[in-house]
Amino acid sequence: MRIFVTGGSGYIGRSVIAELKRRGHHVAALVRSDAATATVRGLGAVAVHGSLTSLDVIELATREHDATIHLAGPKSPDDIAADAALLKMMANVAPDDHVFVYTSGAWVYGDRGDAVVDEAAPLKPIALVAWRAAHEEQALALEAKGVRVVV
């Protein structure tokens, strides 16, 4: 498969790229810096220069790949807005049967203490990630457009 990754130079992204390459996939990763370029190239991936706000770059990469794994974690209000714009763009440009992996985290379930929580649990995100629930719903809505979504 041809797979495009955002956040590929990060902690999780590096492991994901390494595993994808080990399994024989072509991988391209969005990068913002020379250091990130060196990191993803060192893993055998193609560097695609841009940021979460570079929707034209992300759109082209989405069209050129079979799957997109969105690992870039928003860290500011501007990043959160860019993440929402990326999801909106995906609804308009992702080819039929495109695979879109949108990563999340346990904090969308809130602080449950020692309780066991699974994916059927209601979302009660902590303030830091309160925006995530709406974004996850937006990602899941891509299924209606023929995109295969994993959150």
Provide a role label for each language-model segment.
Residues 3-25:
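N-terminal Rossmann NAD(P)H-binding glycine-rich loop of SDR-like oxidoreductase domains
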Residues 87-138, 142, 150:
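Conserved Rossmann-fold NAD(P)-dependent oxidoreductase catalytic core, especially the SDR/UDP-sugar
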Residues 23, 43, 145:
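Conserved dinucleotide-binding and phosphotransfer motif residues
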Residues 34-92, 96:
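NAD(P)H-binding glycine-rich loop region in Rossmannoid oxidoreductase-like domains
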Residues 6, 30, 71, 100-105:
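SDR active-site strand-loop-helix element
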